Amino acid sequence: MLFRSIALFLGFFPVIVEGPICRWEDVEGTLFKNESVKAENVFKGCYRIIWGLFKKMIIADRLAVLVDKVYVGYESYSGAVIVAAAISYTIQLYMEFSGCMDMVIGSAGLFGIRLPENFSQPFFAKTCTDFWKRWHITLGVWFKDRKSVV
């Protein structure tokens, strides 16, 4: 039973490629619960997946076209356009990463499995430290958990 639980945890498809970085304690309560699929979970999961697809495909992918055009031929653009492209790239990066996280969390949510959130409005942070605590939260927790190991 223990081997099966560990194998399921390590091979859990929504987090294996994209994240979020999960600890055993984060998911064991819902990952191993034999619960039937509920309409509420399916609705919430689908909503989160669609929101993630919107962020990734509509916002991030469209910004990528503009940013790539400026970055490839930056010498022919003014400083203001390059600054706008840099800001757009920051938004693109966030929308792509958080959109993928929304899809992962939504996919797990379809089955009633709760995964930790990975973003908490990082661009509203007032300090660099606060930004780091809000951006890729699970990576920060992973580093914090291992600081005594290193």
Identify the residue ranges that each predicted region occupies.
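Membrane-embedded transmembrane alpha-helical bundles that form the catalytic cores
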Residues: 1-150
